[in-house]
Amino acid sequence: MDPDAFTASLFKWDPRTVLSTAPSPRPQLLDYAVTPTTAPMTYHPARLPRELGGLEELFQAYGIRYYTAAKIAELGFTVSTLVDMKDDELDDMMNSLSQIFRWDLLVGERYGIKAAIRAERRRLDEEEIKRRGLLSGDTTNALDALSQEGLSEEPVVQREKEAMGSGGGSTWEVAVVEERRKRQQIRRRRMKMKGNDHGENEEGEEEEEDNISGGGVGGGERQREHPFIVTEPAEVARGKKNGLDYLFHLYEQCREFLIQVQAIAKERGEKCPTKVTNQVFRYAKKAGASYINKPKMRHYVHCYALHCLDEEVSNELRRGFKERGENVGAWRQACYKPLVAIAARQGWDIDAIFNAHPRLSIWYGPTKLRQLCHAERNGAAASSSVSFGTTHLPF
């Protein structure tokens, strides 16, 4: 064999082998290039709920692209965060998305994000209303059971214990429902009393609402912090609380508001109120005097009455309590005794005393003051001494 021929055969170029072997690396390169693009497409559905935190369900029906939701999730936003955000905060979030990721948001996506969040808020609100409706229905049945005569309250207490044990926290719901039920009863009484005289109706409403505001869930007088401190006449109070001169000035403001309400009623041809009623308090609130409210003014009206009927006794009482450092609650209770003494000298008719005074005629006499006068009159009638009713009540 020729050695040159053997050597030449080793280096002979065969175009068929070149054509058959050359294209083989290209599919590998194509597979390598195509594989990364197809693999995430098959992997995304399994990772959607875990990666986006529910954003895909929130934005799915509003034309939001998947990658837009993914970018929002990368910024750390969740469904709960977006629902609690305001509109301007959502605008800042979308602007940050465009600036940080250079991601162009479509106009429809901007509106779609806000629309999806509003829809989610409505859905959550509806679920909360339904949940509260179920709780209030259960607690209303429990309260109705207590309202029946002859029934024990042990089943109701047992239900409350079971609800507390299950983590329902229905004790607060019970208190809210009971307060709501009381107010509904008051409204029904008002509807029945519409045929009565306007003044008597208004007075009954005030007494009932005083009982509601003064009683807690379990009944009894609610202990509230007094917003005033005992001050001497013309003394300026220091600190967060106001003095008694400011308290008496509030009653003068109520008189001015009553005059304005009467003028408006005359212009409209309506019935003019002759006393400070709910209509006056509502007008004061609309006028910006929200610090004037009925519970406060009814609570200290007898103190203002003593100030108007006998200013010297009122000032002396204020000085004495200021020197002893007593609070305004004790001063308020002490104001009853001089008023009972004044009523004893004028036939025990506290309403006539109020109506005869120009500054007190617009106020209803306190129920407690009437009760004290009635009790003192009975004691005076049972006593053999004519002056017993006044001598045992020195200031």
From Swiss-Prot:
Free-text function comment from the UniProt entry: May regulate indeterminacy during leaf and flower development.
Q: Provide the family line.
A: Belongs to the FLO/LFY family.
Q: Where is this site: Interaction with DNA?
A: 271, 278, 282, 329
Region spans: Disordered: 147-170, 185-223
Q: Which GO terms describe its molecular function?
A: DNA binding
Q: Which InterPro entries match?
A: FLO/LFY_C, FLO_LFY, Floricaula/leafy_C_sf, LFY_SAM
Tissue specificity is: Highly expressed in leaf, leaflet, inflorescence and lateral shoot primordia on the main shoot axis, and in floral organ and carpel primordia.
**DNA-binding segment(s):** 224-228, 293-300, 364-367
Q: Pfam families in the record, alphabetically?
A: C_LFY_FLO, SAM_LFY
Q: Name one GO cellular component term.
A: nucleus
Report the source organism.
Answer: Pisum sativum (Garden pea)
Keywords tagged on the record? Activator, Developmental protein, DNA-binding, Nucleus, Transcription, Transcription regulation
- Main localisation: nucleus
Q: Name one GO biological process term.
A: regulation of DNA-templated transcription
Can you say what this protein is called? Answer: Protein UNIFOLIATA
The record's subcellular location field reads:
Nucleus
Q: Where is the composition biased (Acidic residues)?
A: 202-211
